[in-house]
């Protein structure tokens, strides 16, 4: 079944948007942020890749800030705390 990932994420003024697309062989987590919204510090139990579809975010990991814009991606190791701050309206996977 064909699905368009960007159509799955609807930005909300009241909170960040989280959409999980999964089947037995993979999981994609879509995140939508309005400017100023935050994905609080957390860890992941498996390696992950963060991809910025549109917008710009500040990604913090190991005390280092990384500004990521549309098209950028970042490899996140397992069990390392990280967080995301939306600098503008943004969509990530």
Please annotate each region the language model reported:
Residues 1-25, 60:
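A short, N-terminal "cap"/entry segment at the start of jelly-roll beta-barrel domains
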Residues 27-44:
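Conserved short histidine dyad/triad with adjacent acidic residue
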Residues 46-57, 62:
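Glycine- and acidic-residue-biased ligand/ion/polar-headgroup-sensing regions
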Residues 53-54, 69-70, 88:
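A cytosolic small-molecule/anion-sensing beta-strand core signal
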Residues 63-78:
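Short acidic-glycine-tyrosine-enriched beta hairpin
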Residues 78-93:
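Ligand-binding loop in jelly-roll beta-barrel domains
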């Amino acid at each position: 079944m064909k699905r368009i990932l960007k159509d799955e994420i609807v930005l909300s003024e009241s909170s960040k948007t989280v959409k999980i697309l999964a089947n037995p062989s993979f999981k994609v987590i879509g995140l939508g942020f309005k400017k100023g919204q935050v994905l609080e510090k957390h860890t992941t139990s498996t390696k992950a890749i963060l991809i910025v579809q549109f917008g710009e975010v500040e990604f913090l990991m190991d005390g280092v800030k990384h500004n990521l814009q549309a098209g950028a991606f970042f490899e996140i190791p397992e069990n390392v705390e990280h967080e995301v701050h939306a600098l503008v309206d943004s969509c990530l996977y």
